[in-house]
Curated annotation (Swiss-Prot):
Belongs to the HrcA family. Negative regulator of class I heat shock genes (grpE-dnaK-dnaJ and groELS operons). Prevents heat-shock induction of these operons. Keywords: Repressor, Stress response, Transcription, Transcription regulation. GO terms for biological process: negative regulation of DNA-templated transcription. GO terms for molecular function: DNA binding. It comes from Metamycoplasma arthritidis (strain 158L3-1). This is Heat-inducible transcription repressor HrcA.
Amino acid sequence: MEKRTNYPQLTEKQNHFFKLIVDTYIKTGASVASKELVKRCNLKCSSATIRNVMASLEQIGFLEKYHISSGRVPSTLGLEYYAKFLVYNPKKYFDQKLEDLLAKRRIKIDATLEEAAAIVSEVAGVTVVATSNNAAETMKSIQLTTLSELSAIVVIVTSSGRVESKIFNFENSDISLEDLRVAIRLFKERLVDTPLIHLANKARALTPIFGQQLKNYELILQKFIKNIFVFEEETTNKTFNKGAIVLSRNISREEIANVLDLIEKHSVWESIDNDLDEDNNIKLDVSRPNLSIISKKIDFSNEKNIKEITVIGPNNLDYGESFEALEMLEKIIKEKK
């Protein structure tokens, strides 16, 4: 999807009626006819007036004629414009109190991200994806616990609360328990708060220091580099209410497979080219058949290493509610960082 910077200039009248048309489409999921709009919105104008406005909106590419009825549906371009200029309002959504947003959905102020995402996805009928990346995850502590005269366990606790452990056996080994204690002490002094993915390289840089205090320093360092400090950068997606996509009758099986591959294996944020709001790190994709994707980048450190949160739903999803949900989830992440 190409990043769009210029949109047709709409008059105040066109903006007003276009918003009503898309609002109605979102509520009904069906094409919108002029007579229906007059009746549903209690408009004080004729259906002929609405038809003329619809025709002008169709001419500039904001509406499309539905092939089995006289009504019209918003186009991809129209949905982009609606989301960016008629619904998305940072001041309205971003200035609301977190307590009000949580209370609205009966979520406690101390709710975890998982609890909030699960409830929001269920209530709104959308799929929520929380994407984490361990690039900034650090080692907070490294401990040695003796199991017996012939074995011990090395335990690493990370900044996200993750615990990694590895058993060392000393039988038929040139490494003694005392050597291991010295190594752990040096790692505590030199490697705490080091990103996990940099531990191996940082450990190699300690070779001169280890050489001054240990006889078998090369063997010890190699053991840690190959068996303990084996962390690679990983991006992980946690999905809530995946059934909203899988069970949808409006999305083709092929498109479902494509979206599932996206949310299970890739960064949703990086897959979208269209910035809805660069200042607030929000992207929008309505280019997929019967699908809308709104993704928000998380640019602050947090204990879960969350880097982006995404809402996925049909093209007639409630965009205003989706923006509000993303902002609420971002604030919960901030509360927990």
